[in-house]
Amino acid sequence: MNIVNVGKAYGSLTVIHGVSVEIPDGEFVVLVGPSGCGKSTLLRMVAGLEPISFGDIEIDGKVVNNLPPKDRDIAMVFQSYALYPHKTVADNMGFALKMRGERKADIDARVRKAAEILDLVPYLSRYPRQLSGGQRQRVAMGRAIVRDPKVFLFDEPLSNLDAKLRVQMRAEIKELQRRLATTMIYVTHDQVEAMTMADRIVVLRDGRVEQIGSPLTLYDKPANTFVAGFIGSPSMNLVKGHIRSGAAPFFETDEGIRLPLSGAPAASDGKPVYYGIRPEHFLLGGDVRADLTIVESTGSETQVFARLGQQKIIGVFRDRVEAASSQPFAMTPNTAMVHLFDAQSGLRLD
């Protein structure tokens, strides 16, 4: 399917600004961004629940802008399970097929097949009140699966689940997509969900596309400071300062603190830039001294919160770190992993 220069305006206020995404058959695409970025609005336009102001939605090579949702051959799973409390799991899953006038034998067969995929066979005769949150969400997915759509749409389906169940359901949805080999578009504000589930991620901000790419592309080569700060947990450190050229170029903060570079930077002497380094790309020791504020250990790793002058930084280390707060702490960036961004535009400097 294709999203071609799609926009949404409410009067003079444009909230989606010409978004274009080409999605090959069978791809798992995640729309991610902060609250209010337009990801759910875009999904609703794909579903036909929200009119398009301009642009085209193409499914299976056909423009579907004016088709009602029921004729687009899509199935949607919402944050709310929206199950009928007085119907069994089997009846909930097969309800849309019943409304379409499908034969009972066909409905039963498709419900059974979906239930086998989702491990719901033992629960087919139960009612929603007798199920856990994860089981209810699987019923909602089963209701979509039985329709055998060309495209699945997920609108923050895991938001109502606790942390442990979210991890489990992430894996189940990804496995479901692999088994069905059907195109899926998934909306979330959680970048961890995006990183762990997507074939490709579309990062949105204020109704505009900031970057499209595989999870590792976005992580390793963010296009700008927004993507750099949004993708990754903890997020990338962005330290403001200037490039200092010469025989051995380096980065210098406004307070005169120097950070190393590898080779000649793609920026002229004195150019204001952001020096980007992910927390796990600091090395213990070296010549850089930060002022330690907090040390947090999870057992498997240690997070070090510190300051370079007035700018906050975070380092993540596999080693156990024993250090006292308010003391100088040696942590040096791995220069091979440094990113530079233009301080004015925020764009990546290669």
Regions found by a protein language model. Name each.
Residues V32-P34:
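The feature captures the beta-strand-to-loop junction immediately N-terminal to the Walker
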Residues P234-L238, G246-D350:
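Non-catalytic connector elements of ABC transporters
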Residues A47:
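Helix-to-loop junction immediately C-terminal to a conserved catalytic motif
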